[in-house]
Structures are given as structure tokens and as C-alpha cells.
């Protein structure tokens, strides 16, 4: 496994090597040392590459990931896994603002807490947070799943479309057009699958509540003007 030391290797050179892997290459696993909060680590992966980052990263780590597996053995700054298409990103620590923003697929696992706007405008990504999430999470979430083992901050699911939200702890407040919904068997089954994929132990799907869109803001209605 190649070891990339970002104290001596330019980040742009490392990212370029991830984009230029030849078909049939055996060098598909990388270990990254001394990230030291660098921005845009392992962005734009478009194949089955495995990247282990030993330390914390800055903005936009693993952005646009499409098929790779990126694990950060530390915490991540804003925008981790932004616009992810497929693959898996695991943050062993905490994640800052808008984790998983606009993600269209794949799985983002945050083993600590996530700050505000986690899953903003999510479009198919699955996000599992072992800890708590901040305010305005899943704002304008269109599809996908957000699973929170801890608590959720203010305005959860504001202006939500069809993303499904599962929270085990307390929700400080719900955003416009977001309501608690019935947990049906198909939701319990999907939740169990996501918990298993995210390596969550000793937690039952029945411990969660489901939240989703009331579908009252899909089309403008003057009677709902104050909710916009």
C-alpha cells in the first residue's frame, strides 16, 4: 500500500494520482499521513480506490466521490463528501457544517457529531451519524436517508421533499413542512440495513422516530405564505 506523506507530497499531485489510475492496476489502496487539516483531500475519486487518512482534514474531503472508500481517522471540516455519487466515506471523529451536501448516492458515516446543515439538499445519499446533528439539517432534502443516533437541532427537515429522516434522540424543533410520520415495516427494514452498513451495534430500529415532508409546500398556496 503506497503511503502518501502530505508533509512532502503536494496535495494536488496526490489527488491527480487518484484520478489517473490505470485499468487493471493493483495499487488501489492508499494511506495518507500528515494531512494537517488540508482542504480537498481525496476529491474526485471515480473508481474503487481505498484511502485511509491518518489525521484530521479541512474543507471538502472526498467531495464528488464516485465509487471510492475514504476513511478519515480524525475529524473533517465543512462539506465532507459533498456531491458524493457512490461509494463510502467514514469520519471517525466529528464533521463540521453541511456534511454530505447535495449527495446523490453512497454512504456517509460520521462516528462523532455533525454540525449544522448536515445533508442539506441531499439527493439520494444515505447519511448515518452516531452522535448529534446541528440546526437546519436535511434542509430541502430531496431523497435518501438521514439516520441520527443522538439528538437533532432546530429546524430539522426544513422545506423537505422526499428524504426520510430517522432520529433516535430528541428533536429541538422541526422545520417548515416537516412532520413526524408513521414508522412502517419497510422503514424498519431499511433502517436496520443502514445501521448494519454503518457498523452500529446494540441499537434497534424501533428506538427511532421517522420524520418526513407534509407535502404542503410543494405548490404555492397563499394560505401557507407564512411557512415559506
Swiss-Prot record:
Gene3D superfamilies: Glutamate synthase, alpha subunit, C-terminal domain. Transmembrane segments: none annotated. GO terms for molecular function: oxidoreductase activity. Pfam families: GXGXG. Coiled coil: none annotated. Belongs to the FwdC/FmdC family. This is Protein GlxC. It comes from Rhizobium meliloti (strain 1021).
